[in-house]
Structure formats: structure tokens, C-alpha cells
From Swiss-Prot:
Catalyzes the ATP-dependent amination of UTP to CTP with either L-glutamine or ammonia as the source of nitrogen. Regulates intracellular CTP levels through interactions with the four ribonucleotide triphosphates. It comes from the Archaea. ATP binds at S14, V15, G16, K17, G18, T19, D71. This is CTP synthase. It comes from Sulfolobus acidocaldarius (strain ATCC 33909 / DSM 639 / JCM 8929 / NBRC 15157 / NCIMB 11770).
Length: 529
């Protein structure tokens, strides 16, 4: 029988529910339980694929090609699981399924309503995600904040689940406790009100995790307990720490797993956290520093590239180095020649993924600077494509070379739309997505990085290297070190360079704290040498 932990949020969004879910998942899995985590997003988009990164942060791609919420990245990194499309449930997907079933006559003439049809669909999607993994414990994060109108059907669905699974389900409420510096007080009133709102809906939290600058003192816990009907022992602190990866450790210091085991009637087991603790210690005690420039078009919101940032941290911990990240807005490089000076003192340059024409020439300038100055370079997805454009312009002499994504009428279409994309009109969910096989060429940098004849990495793109130019690129010294099963260029590199690698894939999605991405590990190793 699967046990369920439902995590809700109060007071404001972005209070850290995703990190809490991931941390609890890690602790339970390291205790020996089979765990899965599910993110519920109440927005009407079917998935996150068409959202602007400034609005929603990065799109996290799963092995099966789902474009999902970035919280699934937290789940994968912390818990060490591979999620699927079933681990992200959106209101758009729920309503889409309900309307489809109504049109197909699946409801046999009933009046289709929020209760029971929408709530039943939500519960069915949760069950599907759980059944797919045979999870012993499923942690479900309800996105948004208690009181949001769009979240009400999801809260009603989990309220019904509690009725059906009385002994097998618990609620954890995560809410902000603000610290007033002027008076030196922790203010609990907003948290109290958010719990009151939950109780009006019919949900009584079993545990509260208070997000605050400082740990909660015992008096504050007793005050919260009095107004929320939650025992003081079940009120925990998620206070400010240096690293997100410390959150599981501070929760376990407060005996969170014992409390969960007790509430759900599970056999108590001790979580094994020694390796995780070593990882955290390595991050906090580096032996030297490495400065990495990240060149992209969404750098004002760092969460737009969250998995890349975390992949750097994973590799840095393994190497015992401190990464200083220099965020460079690619469009700024186009404004003045002086802007390129930002790259002079860095130890490595990563050109980040991103669609569209804005900032493209700035990215190309950064690539040229890395290539000509022998600075370790990594180009990811669009970053790889633009590395080829730069090479075509400045080495092959094809000055008007471009990608047809930017200039459909370019004289030299070095990057062009994938053949199977040319007749596609629909935007959402239609790219080349998910884990794809890459065949590596022996004797290359890519082969030495992975130490394998073939690998699987996740993808998210519509454009490819134009096969008509592959021979010419190789003639002028570019190495095609990885190709797909049907011959698409997947990885490129250059000889006589410290480290110059472009990959069509997104290796950051599979990086984990205890098993860093080989690409980032090797890049950072060279950059920090």
C-alpha cells in the first residue's frame, strides 16, 4: 500500500516547497524506501514547454521527452530518480483530458463538473504516476499558494484522498515566517492565516515547516501550535543556510524522518547521509577557485539555467573547487566592444541554450573569443549550433553563414530545421525531445569524457547541423565526435585547444550531486587546472 505525503504552501509562492519535497524524498530513499515525487501545477498550460523562462524558470526535460516544471529537476537531483511526464500534472492537462472524455462520451450523459469529474481525473493521474514506479512513498507538491482560485480543485482532490487513505496519507504545510529586523521578532500571523484557509477547505496539516531567516525558538513553535492545531514537535524550521543541499541535513537534525514514519505507520529506518554530507563539505571547503562565464539571453533570472548552474556545482564539489559564476547577457556583448572584456579574466566560457534571434551575435562573439584565446569552451544546444556558425564564418570564410532560425534566407544555411520538423505547425511538445542515443567516435575528446562507444543524453531542439556542410567543416579541422543513429551531428570539438566542445544535447539534466555530468566534470577540470 502506497503512503502519500502532500506538501502545500502558504503566505507566498517560491517559499521552497520543491526543495522540501526533494529533501524529504532524499531522506526517505536513503532510508531504503522506494520513493517518487509528483509536481502539481494549477496553471492551464498543458506543459511548461511554451513558457518564457523569465516567467517560469527553466524547462526541465525528462528521459521520455516531457517538458516539465523545474521542480522535477530538484526531485531528480536530490532523490536520484528519473521522472517521467506522469510526475508533472498541470490543470491544463487535467481539463484537456476531462473535455476529451466528455466529447468521446466516456461520462455517459452525465453533467460534467469539477466534483467529481475533475477531482477524479486528478486522483487518476496521481495513481498513474505512482503505479508506474511501484513507489512505497509518493510525495505530492501542490504548486502555488493556499487560497489561489486555480488550486482549489487540486486541494479538493487531495482532501478526498485523505478520506479514502486515512492511515496512509499526511499533509505537510510549508509557509513563510517573516522576521522583522526592527523589532527582532518572528511574525507567525500570515502562517496562521494560511493554515486557517487550509482548514476551511477541509485539510488539517499534520506537520508545518516554517521557512524563515532564523531557526524557530520553542515559544514561537508553541504559538504556531496553538493556532494551527499541530503539535509543537511537528513544527520544523527550514532556516537560511549557505547551500540548498544542506536542507535535508537540517531537516533530519529535527528528526523529520522519524516523525514521518510515526505518522504513516512505517518501519523506522536510519537515513544514510554520509556521502551527501561529504558532498556538502566539499562544496563548503574548496581548495581553489575557478571563474566561469555563462553567456545567455535570460541571465537576469538565474533559474532560467538552473540545471546548468547545479551541474557546475556538482562537478566543482567533486573537484574541490569553488565556482564563481560570471553571468553575461549576450545582447550586452553586441552593444560595445568593451563588453567582451568581461571574458578576459575567466577560466572557462559556457554558451547557454536559448531560442530566437536576440543576443545571437553576442554569443558568437563570446565563442570566437574562447576559440581564439584558447579558453575552455562548452556550447550547449543552441550554443553548439552557434559555435558551428562562428567557425563557418571565421575559419571557412563563409561570412554570411547563419542558422535559418535567425535568418531563413541566409546564403549559407549552416544550421537548418530538422527534416521531420518542416511540416509541423503546432508548437507545444513537438520538438526533438528526451533521451536520444549518441554514437561517439573513438580517439576524440567526447569519447574520453564518456569512456563509452555510445551514450544517452536528453534533447530539446528543432534545428540541426546542415548535412551538406559536414564534409566542409571536417575538411577545415572541426571534429564531429558524436552523431545520432540516423547521422545527425550531436557533438563537435576542435583539436589544439585546451577544451572546445559543443553538444546538441543537454547533459545538465542528468547531473546529480553524487554523480556529476562527465561533460561538466571534464570541462571544469580543465578550466581549473
Amino acid at each position: 500500500m502506497t503512503k502519500y505525503i502532500i506538501v502545500t504552501g502558504g503566505v507566498l509562492s517560491s517559499v521552497g516547497k520543491g526543495t522540501i519535497v526533494a529533501s524529504i524524498g532524499f531522506l526517505l530513499k536513503s532510508s531504503g524506501y522506494n520513493v517518487t515525487a509528483i509536481k502539481v501545477d494549477p496553471y492551464l498550460n498543458v506543459d511548461a514547454g511554451t513558457m518564457n523562462p523569465y516567467m517560469h524558470g527553466e524547462v526541465f526535460v525528462t528521459d521520455d521527452g516531457a517538458e516539465t516544471d523545474l521542480d522535477l529537476g530538484h526531485y531528480e537531483r536530490f532523490i536520484g530518480i528519473n521522472t517521467t511526464r506522469y510526475n508533472n500534472i498541470t490543470a491544463g492537462r487535467v481539463y484537456f483530458e476531462v473535455i476529451r472524455k466528455e466529447r468521446e462520451g466516456k461520462y455517459l450523459g452525465q453533467t460534467v463538473q469539477i466534483i467529481p469529474h475533475v477531482t477524479d481525473e486528478i486522483k487518476g493521474l496521481v495513481k498513474k504516476a505512482v503505479d508506474d514506479t511501484n513507489a512505497e512513498i509518493a510525495i505530492i507538491e501542490i504548486g502555488g499558494t493556499v487560497g489561489d482560485i486555480e488550486g482549489l480543485p487540486f486541494l479538493e482532490a487531495v482532501r478526498q484522498m485523505k478520506l479514502e487513505e486515512e492511515e496512509n496519507l499526511m499533509f505537510i504545510h510549508v509557509a513563510l515566517v517573516e522576521y522583522l529586523r526592527v523589532t527582532g521578532e518572528l511574525k507567525t500571523k500570515p502562517l496562521q492565516h494560511s493554515v486557517q484557509e487550509l482548514r476551511r477547505i477541509g485539510i488539517q496539516p499534520d506537520m508545518i515547516i516554517a521557512r524563515s531567516i532564523l531557526p524557530l525558538d520553542e515559544e514561537t513553535k508553541k504559538k504556531i501550535a496553538l493556532f494551527t492545531n499541530v503539535k509543537p514537535d511537528y513544527i520544523l524550521s527550514n532556516y537560511d543556510v549557505e547551500l540548498t543541499y544542506e536542507v535535508p541535513l537540517i531537516l533530519e537534525k529535527q528528526n523529520i524522518t522519524k516523525k514521518i514514519f510515526n505518522k504513516l505507520g512505517l518501519e523506522p529506518k536510519e537515513p544514510k547521509v554520509a556521502e551527501w554530507l561529504e558532498f556538502v563539505e566539499n562544496m563548503k571547503n574548496p581548495s581553489k577557485e575557478v571563474k566561469i562565464a555563462l553567456v545567455g539571453k535570460y541571465t537576469k533570472l538565474k533559474d532560467s539555467y538552473l540545471s546548468i548552474k547545479e551541474a557546475i556545482y556538482h562537478a566543482a564539489a567533486k573537484l574541490r573547487v569553488k565556482p564563481t559564476l560570471v553571468w553575461v547577457e549576450s545582447s550586452d556583448l553586441e552593444k560595445s566592444e568593451d563588453e567582451i572584456n568581461k571574458l578576459k579574466d575567466v577560466n572557462g566560457i559556457i554558451v547557454l541554450p536559448g531560442f530566437g534571434a536576440r543576443g545571437v551575435e553576442g554569443k558568437i562573439q563570446a565563442i570566437k573569443f574562447a576559440r581564439e584565446n584558447n579558453i575552455p569552451f562548452l556550447g550547449i544546444c543552441f550554443g553548439m549550433q552557434l559555435a558551428i556558425v562562428e567557425y563557418a564564418r571565421n575559419v571557412l570564410g563563409l561570412k554570411e553563414a547563419n542558422t535559418t532560425e535567425v535568418n531563413p534566407n541566409t546564403k549559407y544555411p549552416i544550421i537548418t530545421l530538422l527534416d521531420n520538423q518542416k511540416k509541423i505547425v503546432q508548437v507545444g511538445g513537438t520538438m526533438r525531445l528526451g533521451a536520444q542515443k549518441i554514437i561517439l567516435k573513438e580517439g576524440t575528446l567526447a569519447y574520453s569524457i564518456y569512456n563509452s562507444p555510445h551514450i544517452y543524453e536528453r534533447h530539446r531542439h528543432r534545428y540541426e547541423v546542415n548535412p551538406e556542410y559536414v564534409d566542409l567543416l571536417q575538411k577545415y579541422g572541426m571534429i564531429i565526435s558524436g552523431v545520432s543513429e540516423n547521422g545527425l551531428v550531436e557533438i563537435i570539438e576542435l583539436k589544439n585547444h585546451k577544451f572546445f566542445l559543443g553538444t546538441q544535447a543537454h547533459p545538465e539534466y542528468k547531473s546529480r550531486p553524487l554523480s556529476p555530468s562527465p561533460v561538466f566534470l571534464n570541462f571544469l577540470s580543465v578550466a581549473s587546472a
